[in-house]
A protein has these predicted regions:
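Alpha-helical scaffold segments that mediate packing/assembly in large oligomeric complexes
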Residues: 96, 100-181, 298-303
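Sequence/fold signature of self-assembling virion shell proteins
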Residues: 2-59, 110, 151-170, 202-303
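Long, hydrophobic/aromatic-enriched structural stretches that serve as scaffold segments
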Residues: 55-113, 117
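Helix N-cap / beta->alpha transition motif
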Residues: 91-102, 195-199, 249-251, 291-292
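Ordered core of a single globular domain
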Residues: 174-210
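Short secondary-structure junctions and interdomain/linker hinges
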Residues: 30-31, 130, 134, 183-190, ...
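Short coil/turn segments at secondary-structure boundaries
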Residues: 135-140, 190-196, 216-219
Length: 303
């Protein structure tokens, strides 16, 4: 028994780095946020994130002497990944009798897949979309492979995480403003507010109604807007589609863990001469965590 792997690998191998990077970093999808995350590489299954917090104390230096003051706190937090795969296969003969049969050559050496580049492109986009949803909405208790940021915030054991707070405003603008006012002062300058496309759409219309909105259309799709009177951005997040909660944090606080971004994640397509099937295999690991619970605000709408 043997395999003929020379048929379809040329397209995938030539672009392998692009395919792998796009598939695990959210390339070329609408509203992706994974590229904003801090990356923790070399994580196989579970690892501790080590970080420190330094608080220097300024003293009166008008006299001689030395008095050590201040604090340096070393902290760690677990981040866990799941090994994720995608497997599929196609029989090129299934194209016979269909509109696509013009791309099929009927012979014993046929080892190509009609619309190969289109299929691989859709695979990458599909993985992007599912990973984006997983890192935000994943819940292992519901059978998902990892816990996403919403689940992590809701289950935080830190009293400093602001979760379950009610954004009492009736409009998206008022709810987002309520969330903004809950962001701790120490983090607000770097914070971003993440909302679903539905909330973002309503927010944009609320700004129009208040005459706070200006968009010239030159920058393509509208994915973020500032809160008027601040430098905090509101980000349209497709991973939050269907979620009526508002999440605010500092992007550097949001960690995406994996083994390697290119070397070990595998995107492979090949022709199996034994069963005459074209097969694809994608394999990578992924997980998310937050470093500082007190830099997270999660609000729910008023009942």
């Amino acid at each position: 028994m043997g395999y003929n792997v020379s048929g379809l690998t040329s397209y995938v191998e030539t672009n392998k780095d692009v395919l792998v990077k796009d598939a695990v970093l959210g390339g070329n999808i609408k509203g992706e946020t994974l590229s904003m995350f801090t990356k923790q590489l070399g994580v196989k299954t579970k690892e501790r994130l080590n970080y420190l917090d330094v608080d220097p104390v300024l003293q009166d230096g008008s006299s001689c002497g030395f008095s050590a003051q201040g604090s340096t706190v070393l902290t760690d937090r677990d981040i866990e990944t799941a090994v994720i795969k995608y497997n599929d296969q196609w029989c090129w003969k299934a194209m016979l009798g269909r509109f696509s049969e013009y791309q099929v050559r009927i012979n014993a050496n046929e080892d190509s897949l009609p619309f190969e580049s289109e299929i691989t492109d859709q695979i990458v986009k599909g993985i992007n979309k599912k990973v984006e949803t997983l890192i935000w909405q994943g819940d292992k208790d519901d059978g998902d492979l990892i816990n996403g940021l919403i689940t992590i915030a809701e289950g935080s054991d830190s009293a400093s995480t602001i979760t379950g707070a009610t954004a009492s405003g009736a409009t998206a603008y008022e709810r987002i403003l309520d969330t903004y006012m809950l962001i701790p002062e120490a983090w607000v300058d770097e914070a971003v507010i993440f909302v679903s496309p539905a909330i973002f759409r309503q927010y944009a219309q609320d700004l129009v109604a208040k005459n706070f909105f200006h968009y010239d259309g030159e920058n393509g799709e509208l994915t973020e807007l500032f809160i008027p009177g601040s430098d905090v951005k509101v980000r349209k997040t497709y991973g939050l589609t269907g979620v009526d909660k508002i999440y605010a944090s500092v992007p550097a606080n949001m960690v995406y863990a994996c083994d390697m971004l290119d070397a070990n994640e595998d995107f492979k397509m090949w022709y199996n001469d034994e069963d005459e099937l074209v097969k694809v295999k994608v394999l990578f690991n992924a997980g998310v965590a937050t470093l500082y619970p007190d830099a997270v605000v999660l609000t729910t709408p008023a009942a």
